Regions:
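Bacterial N-terminal signal peptides that target proteins for export
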Residues: 1-7
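Hydrophobic h-region of N-terminal signal peptides that target proteins for export
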Residues: 11-19
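Serine residues within intrinsically disordered or low-complexity segments
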Residues: 18, 415-419, 702, 709
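Accessory carbohydrate-recognition regions in carbohydrate-active enzymes
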Residues: 20-391, 397-402, 418-471, 479-505, ...
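Short, low-complexity, charge-dense intrinsically disordered segments
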Residues: 405-415, 419, 694, 698
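ATP-dependent phospho-/nucleotidyl transfer catalytic cores
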Residues: 476
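Charged/polar low-complexity intrinsically disordered segments
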Residues: 527-531, 696-699, 705, 709
Length: 760
């Protein structure tokens, strides 16, 4: 394809995007450079597939399979993770080419030939003169490959996958085969989890001939090269049905979503669905602000992914096939990250989805026997610390309880499929209690007997991350205590409330830092509060951070933490110093997840995300306003390397969206948001209000269907580069007392107005 044709195609792509008021602002390439670990390919909101180019696959750099700075594409795989710190997926590689067949086929490409839009990706493969386009449906991918006239070839590679230097050890086997005009089969893989995926690939042109490439030693899955006669100059359209259940599931998905080869129809449908999804919020601001805002929303809604087929079947945590209630079962739950801001934000702008996330979490528990930690394709990889599906469930329970406690019976829709009766929540609480008191098979991250005996995790028993584990578990315990109290389990509530305060046992009064201790109560010595820990097996008391960062991780008791480290004045100085204290690598060591540093504050990793919102507790709101602005200016930039760290399945984006509005859930299960300093003149949330399903003790705390839609507006009057400080705040015309706002006040609708000034 010549340069003139490329320009025409690119212009056509931009014209399509401009038809949609919000999707046109999205730049999927943001985060594909640097440490963002995003990908540029086609997506569908919460969809199972993400057809996207792969420029690499074997290291931390390639968690999403693509680096903006690369110049060669190895093919297009069907599934990708967005913003994670560990790579996986990259299932089923397709690569169009001409000439000699090879498993190593790749092509140079130029960034100026790329078109990246919600639901669409295109690029020119320069080595072959092929224009490649991709789009997505909820469970299927579709491609259009425009070849030079003549014979065209397509590599279908079942030995491909992201993650691991030795792919032969991760692909366990495949029964993939060519049948007529289709390639189909099931491939088994083991990397982050052990799983299987099934697929059906169909073509709009007959297969002229095909061959199976020779397998290298140890390879257990085939690669096929198929040839097509495109002498008439028409493009080759390829559609891919995908399923975790089986080939029959992939066939059903394909028949339901891609009954024909209408590429443009699928592309338009994906763009329209993205625009509808992004319409949950509106903003006023500059073009650059709109790009940053709607790109953050886009990254938010790439996942979790609905892994249930069109008939509702899914493969669960136990490896068995189940039927999903309402036809949805979500995976890619990066809960150590997303419990902090993603899920609280979803309760405001995607309440319908949050209810499904909670249902999925509890279905997972019923199959696996414990609450999930980090789910991928229906399985739990148990990555990271804590059990943060617990705050997600408890937050939803407490918020819907607050909304429904005064609901009249006449408001109830008792036929709603989303009705949650007391039995549902009692079962949820029982699952939470089990997960916080019993060790389950394959789960060795916590030692409950040691915790209950010592009141902390002795680092000669729990030899890695003992302090971080304690702090995270204290928050889970606090959540359990609140749910137990609401359900009337007073004894349990007292137990979990007491245990949630154990963080006090690792605050060293002499240094003012959280610090590891052994079974004799001795503090970790020597002690360097700047030294970075990594993950399990490293021997550090901290997870992906140091004592400077983790000392502030008491989400459930910020006031008590401030007193424990010396009171408001000392704590305030310490927090302010956190953002200016610089240290040499010789003092800190290294950790690849510790990025986006501002002093010792680490915006590129989640444990620091709430710290700016501690500043009102110590009377430092002016400094808070300065820091929010600095983070926006430095760490959220509308370019490929514009994210300062892994987007972590939308958590980094959720921080941006909350902070743009001027509030943030410091305690993400409290139903309370701490005020900050808004960064946009106006943000409007289109609300979905939920109501209860009945009176009495049998039907309580129940989110149901959408009652009506209304709006909550956040206005920042006189906001400018200079006017970054908050002078006053009103809610619906009345002065807002304190520095927090309740969830129920937001979802009632109304207007939050910040008067901005240039004076601290």
């Amino acid at each position: 394809m010549n340069r003139k044709m490329v320009a025409v195609v690119t212009a056509a792509g931009l014209a399509t995007a401009s038809c949609y008021a919000r999707a046109k602002w999205v730049r999927p390439e943001i985060g594909t450079g640097g440490d963002g670990h995003t990908f540029p390919g086609a997506t569908y909101p919460f969809g199972l597939v993400q057809p996207s180019p792969d420029t690499g696959r074997e290291s931390y750099r390639y968690c999403a399979g693509y680096r903006y700075e690369d110049s060669r594409i190895f093919g297009f795989s069907q599934t990708h993770l967005s913003g994670t710190g560990c790579g996986d997926l990259g299932d089923l590689r397709l690569m169009p080419f001409t000439g000699a067949a090879s498993a190593e086929v790749s092509s140079a490409f130029r960034k100026e030939t790329q078109v990246c839009e919600p639901g669409y990706y295109a690029v020119t493969l320069d080595d072959f003169g092929v224009r490649a386009e991709a789009s997505a449906a909820p469970h299927c991918a579709v491609y259009r490959f425009a070849f030079p006239k003549g014979e065209a070839s397509l590599l279908v590679d079942c030995m491909w996958g992201i993650g691991g230097k030795e792919i032969t050890k991760t692909i366990l086997g495949s029964d993939a085969r060519v049948e007529g005009n289709r390639v189909l089969g099931t491939t088994r893989r083991r990397y982050w989890v052990t799983r299987q995926y099934s697929f059906v690939v169909e073509f709009d042109h007959p297969v002229k001939s095909w061959e199976k490439l020779p397998a290298a030693e140890g390879e257990k899955a085939p690669r096929f090269v198929l040839k097509f006669d495109l002498s008439d100059g028409s493009p080759l359209v390829v559609k891919v049905g995908y399923s975790l259940v089986g080939v029959d599931g992939a066939e059903k998905n394909l028949a339901a979503e891609l009954p024909d080869f209408g590429f443009d129809r699928i592309r338009a449908a994906a763009a329209a669905e993205w625009d509808r999804t992004l319409s949950r919020m509106e903003i006023e601001g500059s073009d650059t602000e709109k790009v940053n805002f709607f790109s953050a929303m886009y990254r938010l809604f790439i996942q979790p992914n609905n892994i249930a087929d069109v008939d509702g079947r899914y493969r669960g945590a136990d490896g068995e096939v189940h039927n999903a209630q309402g036809g949805v079962y979500y995976s890619t739950l990066s809960l150590w990250d997303t419990f902090r801001a993603y899920h609280p934000l979803a309760t405001l702008i995607a309440a319908d989805k949050e209810d499904g996330f909670v249902e999925t979490i509890l279905e997972h528990q019923r199959a696996a026997g414990f609450m999930p930690i980090w789910t991928l394709m229906g399985k739990d990889n148990q990555c990271m610390i804590g059990t943060h599906s617990i705050p997600v469930v408890v937050d939803w329970f407490l918020k819907t309880e607050a909304l429904t406690r005064d609901a009249a019976p006449a408001d109830a829709d008792k036929s709603s499929v989303h009705s949650r009766d007391r039995a549902f929540w009692e079962a949820a609480y029982a699952a939470i209690k089990d997960s916080l008191t019993k060790l389950h098979k394959g789960r060795k991250l916590e030692d409950w007997p040691a915790l209950d005996k010592y009141g902390y995790y002795p680092n000669d028993i729990v030899t890695s991350e003992s302090v971080s584990r304690l702090l995270e578990n204290c928050f889970d315990d606090w959540c359990a205590a609140k749910m137990a109290a609401k359900l009337g389990h007073a004894e349990d509530a007292a137990f979990f409330e007491k245990r949630s305060r154990n963080w006090r046992n690792v605050v060293d009064p002499e240094t003012g830092f959280v610090r590891g201790r052994d079974t004799n109560g001795n503090w970790t010595t020597p002690f360097n509060p700047l030294a970075l820990g990594r993950n399990a097996g490293t021997g550090s008391d901290y997870t992906e951070g140091n004592a400077w960062q983790w000392t502030w991780h008491v989400l459930n008791e910020p006031e008590a933490l401030i007193e424990a480290v010396g009171g408001k004045e000392r704590a305030g100085e310490r927090i302010v110093n956190l953002f200016t204290l610089k240290a040499d690598e010789s003092e800190t060591g290294t950790c690849e997840d510790v990025t986006g540093l501002m002093g010792q504050y680490c915006h590129g990793n989640e444990p620091s995300h709430h710290v700016i919102y501690l500043l009102p507790y110590v009377g430092r709101t002016a400094r808070q306003a300065e820091l929010v602005r600095a983070v926006f200016d430095e760490f959220y930039v509308a370019k490929p390397d514009g994210l300062c760290g892994n987007d972590d399945c939308g958590q980094m984006s959720a921080w941006y969206l909350f902070s743009a509005m001027g509030f943030y859930p410091l305690n993400p299960a409290s139903g309370e948001y701490v005020l900050g300093a808004p960064q946009l003149p106006k943000v409007t949330i289109k609300l979905e209000k939920t109501v209860g399903v009945g009176e009495g003790t049998d039907k309580i705390h129940s989110p149901t269907q959408t009652r009506d839609s209304n709006y909550f507006r956040v206005v920042a009057k006189n906001l400018s580069k200079e006017n970054k400080y908050v002078k006053s705040v009103t809610l619906n015309g009345k002065p807002l007392e304190g520095f927090t706002i309740r969830h129920e006040d937001i979802v009632k609708g109304g207007e939050l107005v910040f008067e901005m000034t240039d004076r601290p």
